[in-house]
Amino acid sequence: MNKLRLVKEKRTPQICDSVNEYFSMILYYKEDSFVKINYFVHTEIGDRPCNEDRYAVSKCPAGLCFALADGLGGLDRGEVAAELACNAVAEYAQAQAVFSNAAVEQAFLRAQQAVLARQKAEHNETQMKTTLNVVMLDKQSMYWGHVGDSRTYYAENGVLKQRTLDHSVTQMLSAIGQVEERDIRFHEDRSRLLRVLGTPWEKPQAETEQPVALRGNMQILLCTDGFWEYITEEQIQICLEESDNAQIWMENMLELISRNDQHSERDNRTAITIWIDDGEGDITQ
């Protein structure tokens, strides 16, 4: 019988000045084989007066749901928008019997509605905005989407395959050849966003990616701009090659980031690494 077993689980959005959390779980998809998943969460305040990043990891009837949000700095109550978004995603995902691209799209809609409702209640329609990334994992697939410039990367067999494209001015300039992809993180307009939660939409602005078949030796990274701006894709790849679980991958990247940002004012920094492996046999033995 298919079942989901967590050795440890985190159900609610979490935040504080600095957190490291490691979890491991087993997702059955056949009687004699299963997917082993471990994930690691890191968040830190950096040199900012408060941490406006939020995350949620949820065990759901359909599988696992990860949400990561970065409240817009310089705007009022960005951390509230980020927490509302993560709460809305977690609550929606926990009520779903199955995951799909439609479920991801609906999760973004629920998050947008939650932020707009709070804006209206507090007469604060021009502020309170956030990015949001969502990853849903069931027994067969990864469903994922984003809005803003927080990123999701995924890799297979230790090789990076794809990342979400930022909804930013610099990503747009890169698409038309005016900025090199590798230079996005250094561009003066990198924080000018074109899509976020908390701005009224005429039509949904979140972008969903094609589902990815869930398989062993698969890795996923969700991260805010305070993380990816200080590590290149080449460095992420090197760290991945030198790792065999989510915690080591995260620690390898954080070590490089600490070297790269020594002369910079550190932004809030939050990331989730997910490591998926195949297993065989009876785990109850």
Where are these regions (language model features)?
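PP2C/PPM-type serine/threonine phosphatase catalytic domain
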Residues: 3-285
